[in-house]
Amino acid sequence: MAVAWIGNREALVERAAAHAAALLGSSRCPVFSLDTDIHGTRAAIALAERVGAAYDHADGAALSRETALFTDKGAMTVAPGETRRRADVVVIVGELPQIYHEFVGELAETVPDLSAKNQREFFLVGPNGASAPPLNNGRTATLLSCGEASLGATLAALRAQYRGRQTSQPVSNFDDFAKALAAARFPVFLFSGDATEGLALEMLQGLIADLNRTSRASGLHLPASENGWGSALASTWMTGFPLRTGFARGFPDFDPWRYDVARMIASGEADLHLRISSSIVPPQKKRSRMALIALAKTQKPVAGAAVTIAIGEAGVDHEAVVYSSRTGSLRSVDARAKSELPSAATIIHLVASHISAEAALPC
């Protein structure tokens, strides 16, 4: 089975890696899109430093909203295990990614063993018609809504009513919510940046801070992408900054607008795009003058790519270290269907071996 291509022609992996290295070495503004495990992220950041590239997550917008909450405003959060054991009121804020529906169902099936209350109550913040992840045993979440108002506006109204202030439109079922909070020992708000705007995340943290004036409350961050959040953590311990960092000036430079890789590609700033995705991804449109290097789980060359190298999927084709939202930390995973496909880190190291460590960085 072919695993590497230069253009549409099959090639040896070594030769394809050397060609990718030559393209990177001649690029004036390379950008990387990451969707990979911890080892792949670390290798990609090391390569970015060597060639002066900027790097971001493949779905950078959602991840940027989440990182901005922590870098710009700060957040009060709790671990998933503490949520399972202590949360007697669970508030689902907006829509959660599908991968977390099972976790919410487990919360509905269990009771907090470190709480005096032997039950959990569920609420959902969102517009009319919003639906919570399925709760087992026929349970439903009580909707807290301001009609068709946005999530941010609903959270603002919820916060105002909690503080006893007037609102232009009351939040539905607020009395039930206030009663549950009064009896709660530890309410937890589940949130994600996947479909939640930045101002809504900030307003949520304001509400949590208000609750902590008289009692305890916290939020549980459920990342829009587990790979993305793992990459953000790896980037932070390697450079001091999360994703959307660049090395164009020879040192790590964090700028969430400037190094928004999707924006850089759309505006024509980037002349080379290295996309690293250890899961199967559909072909993406690219600018005609921009070279594309694709490291992806694929059986054929990616359309329009100058170089394509097939890589395995973390936890499927090879062992890996990944971020786990169930534990709120990193964990190692075994290969579920081990194959001969190389890991992203292996290929990135191979590409880097063809680039001089003393190579001049772009201006």
Task: Map each language-model feature to its residues.
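N-terminal juxtadomain amphipathic helix
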Residues: 1-7
